[in-house]
Swiss-Prot record:
Any GO BP annotation: response to wounding
Region feature (Disordered): 160-181, 209-269
Location of the protein in the cell: Nucleus; Cell membrane
UniProt record similarity statement: Belongs to the TIFY/JAZ family.
Name by which UniProt lists this protein: Protein TIFY 11B
């Protein structure tokens, strides 16, 4: 009997030592209340709503179940099986993770400068709307790309020059064009020759009057002919103007001849 009780006492002492170390490191049991509640806490809990009371009860139940589980583990011997005394750190401050409830949620849509909000919108329909929006976006991008390609094609169009002869034209059209050019040149030359011939006839008709006009030269003025008088010279040495030449008397002789010819015509008549 003495041999069977010794290992049980050693296990119990190890557990007690582990608990003492845990308390020294943490300073308290954390959220473990060991089923003990203060009067002030109960009074505050009574002031809350029904929902708040339910939450407090749930927390108390969880806090009661956790220390009992720890005590069971220590009693069974699951805390430490090795010879070395190693403390097990359990963080009891973290609340239990609650899985999100799958249900309807709020949906906001920004479209055309407007904001639309839908409450309690199912997830399936939201996914369908997202797929439709993606397809519409692809269609809009394709249409923009096609328009840009069309604009580039229009800008690259080469306008043919109608003045230049095209390579696809017939040789007959080119020959006829050359013939028309030759005919136009000949017509221009002929019109120029006619114009010059008329000018010659007019010059011949006006020739005698022009000769008489050019033949009569007026005598030069004395101011232009007289040289400048130098200082110390007398007025006697002033040069006399030159005498007019014989051809200056030609207009008088021509007038006399015309008068005689007019008299002869009168006598004949």
């Amino acid at each position: 009997m003495s041999t069977g009780q010794a290992p049980e006492k050693s296990n119990f002492s190890q557990r007690c030592s582990l608990l003492s170390r845990y308390l020294k490191e943490k300073g308290s049991f954390g959220n473990i209340n060991m089923g003990l509640a203060r009067k002030s806490d109960l009074e505050l809990a009574g002031k809350f709503d029904l929902k708040g009371q339910q939450n407090v009860i749930k927390k108390v139940e969880t806090s009661e179940t956790r220390p009992f589980k720890l005590i069971q583990k220590f009693s069974i011997g699951e805390a430490s099986t090795s010879t070395e005394d190693k403390a097990i750190y359990i963080d009891l401050s973290e609340p239990a993770k609650v899985a999100p409830e799958s249900g309807n949620s709020q949906l906001t849509i920004f479209f055309g400068g407007k904001v639309m909000v839908f409450n309690e919108f199912p997830e399936d329909k939201a996914k369908e709307i997202m797929e439709v929006a993606k397809e519409a976006n692809h269609v809009a991008v394709d249409s923009k790309n096609s328009q840009s390609h069309m604009n580039l094609d229009k800008s690259n169009v080469v306008i043919p020059d109608l003045n230049e002869p095209t390579s696809s034209g017939n040789n007959e059209d080119q020959e006829t064009g050359q013939q028309h050019q030759v005919v136009e040149r000949i017509a221009r030359r002929a019109s120029l020759h006619r114009f010059f011939a008329k000018r010659k006839d007019r010059a011949v008709a006006r020739a005698p009057y022009q000769v008489n006009q050019h033949g009569s030269h007026l005598p030069p003025k004395p101011e232009m002919v007289a040289p400048s008088i130098k200082s110390g010279q007398s007025s006697q040495h002033i040069a006399t103007p030159p005498k007019p030449k014989a051809h200056n008397h030609m207009p008088m002789e021509v007038d006399k001849k015309e008068g005689q010819s007019s008299k002869n015509l009168e006598l004949k008549l």
